[in-house]
Amino acid sequence: MRALLKKDFDTLTKHYKMYVILLVFFLFAGSVSTTDEFFSTFPMVICSWFTANLIAYDEKQEGSSASGRKLYVQSKYLFQFITVAFSMIVCVSGLSSRYGVGSADFCNVLLMMLAAAFLVPAVMLPIIFKNSAEKSTLKYLAVLIIGVAMCYYFSAAFEARYIAHISLGLVIAAGLLMLALYFLSYRLSVKYYEKREI
């Protein structure tokens, strides 16, 4: 597992430097921005780009299943989780200084970040592992666009109606539910990938 993760990080920094630079830019912008929620949530979407592009790179190199298919899927989900966790730590530190931990605005943006971090890849990765990254490009982009649009739409609707009642406990409960869906997505991806002909 460690070797697979190291390979992914090496591939990312060697072949996808622009994505890394883009992530750093948005992490910095998200940590200092005083109003725009987009800069706080978009880094989570970029992390999904990382994972999808790494899978596509592996498929071109014909080395995606060299270490066993289940272990390979595990490494991609763990890589996604690590990059998202790092990004969230940076962005949440900015949110806490901007809004204050536990405030309604803080909880609302954090909820949107969690959705972008876990719901988008939970839908996207099984599609990729079932069909291959190349065949799933349009579906992947559709999931990203729809997912981000839904995050903003429901966030705005939620904020307008319930923001006064949102609490950190509710956000934590929602986050745990999203993690459970992320785990179910992993199980589904393993099932699809083990059955797929390569």
Where are these predicted regions, by residue range?
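Short helix-to-coil transition segments within interhelical loops
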Residues: G63-R69
